Design a protein with these regions (language model features):
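Catalytic core and acceptor-binding pocket of nucleotide-sugar-dependent glycosyltransferases
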Residues: 38-162
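GT-A fold catalytic core of metal-dependent nucleotide-sugar glycosyltransferases
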Residues: 1-31, 35-38, 45
Length: 162
């Protein structure tokens, strides 16, 4: 499915979330910088420059997601007036806030999961699930109760955001 159909035309930046509270504009949503869309404008180019420069204000080797979480309000409420929207985890699913609805999801992200080997294991299950789902006829998809395989290996390592 094309994820871009679900990104607001009015957003300067749309970003996936680890936790989505139902309000796409609420800054208390937990952003995940593993998937984001930025409309190319002078303001968004400047936002990306400031995001990169802001890393120097944080501990050495701070992750870009940690930096973004701390400064996102500066972009929205500051001089840049960035229109930031958070993507619904029902469409942009991930292991943090797992929905399992194959008939709606556009992307699947192994967020909150530690260690590459566990991510790869559970993402391989996602690919196998998608192949099974994609092979069904439309009537079979409508009546199917197929869901994503629970990310069991990742669940054992979950780093759940506060």
């Amino acid at each position: 499915r094309n994820p871009f159909r679900h990104i607001s035309l009015y957003a300067d930046m749309a970003i996936s979330t680890d936790r989505f509270n139902g309000d796409a504009e609420d800054l208390t949503n937990a952003p995940n910088t593993g998937f984001y869309y930025v409309r190319s404008t002078n303001r968004t180019v400047e936002m990306l420059r400031r995001w990169r420069a802001a890393r120097s204000r944080f501990r050495p080797k701070a992750h870009d997601q940690e930096v973004f979480e701390a400064i996102k309000g500066e972009f929205v409420g500051g001089e840049l007036q960035i229109k930031l929207v958070f993507l619904d985890t029902a469409l942009f699913d991930g292991f943090c806030e797992y929905h399992g609805e194959m008939d709606r999801v556009c992307t699947m992200h192994a967020n909150c999961c530690l260690r590459l080997v566990t991510k790869l294991h559970d993402l391989r299950n996602v690919v196998a699930d998608w192949k099974r789902y994609s092979s069904l006829t439309p009537p079979e998809k409508m009546s199917s109760k197929l869901r994503w395989t629970y990310p069991a290996k990742c669940a054992a390592t979950m780093k759940i955001p506060a």
